[in-house]
Amino acid sequence: ILPLLRGEIVSKKTDWFEVREAQIQLPCYTQPHIEMAVACARSPSGALAAGKHGLGMLSIGGTSDDALTHHANNWKICEETAIANKKHVDRKNWRVVTLAHIADTREQALKNVRFGIEQFARYFREIATFPIVPDNIHNAAEYLMENNMACIGTPDDAIKYIEKLQKGTGGFGAYMELAHNWADWQATKRHYELMSRYVAPHFKGLN
C-alpha cells in the first residue's frame, strides 16, 4: 500500500494476492501520503508493523492497568523497531481507544447507560471473540469502572480518567472512544457536547 500511496507502479505476487502494474487513481492530497495507523492490542505484531513502516499506532484491547502496561511496552517496541528500520515514529501519532459516557451528573450517566450497556456486554460475550465483561458479572457498568476499563460519570471524571491513561502509557497523542450505543441518541449527543465543551479544552489549555 505504501508504495502505491507514494505514486509508484507496483507489480507483486504473494501466496494470497497478485497485482500487476497497479497504481492509484487519485494521488494523496496529504503528503507524503494519507496518515496511517496500525491497530495493536496485546500482541506486539501491530507495534512491529507500525515501527517497521514509520506509521502511527492505534492501541485497542482495553485500558485496565494491565492493558496500559501492555500498551506502553508495545509503544517501546514500536520505537525500537522504527530505529532499527531507519524510520521515525512520534507519540503524537499514537492513539489509545477506550470506552466512556458522561453526563451532567454521575447518577445521570449511570442511568443513561442502562439503555444499552448490558446488550453491549452480551454481544462481546456471545458473538465477538473477546468478552469485555465476564459471564458471571451482573453489573457491566460497575465492573468496567472498577477495572479502569471505562469512564461513566461527569466531565471532571473524564478528565481524571484521561490523565490516568496518559500516566499509565507514558503519554499518547490522541484519545479515541469506541461508539458503543450505551445510551440513547439524545444522551449520546449530550456526552459528545460535554466532551467537546469541557474535557477537550482542558487538555488543550483553553479553559
Predicted features by range, described:
Residues 1-207:
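Active-site-adjacent structural elements that line small-molecule/cofactor binding pockets in enzymes
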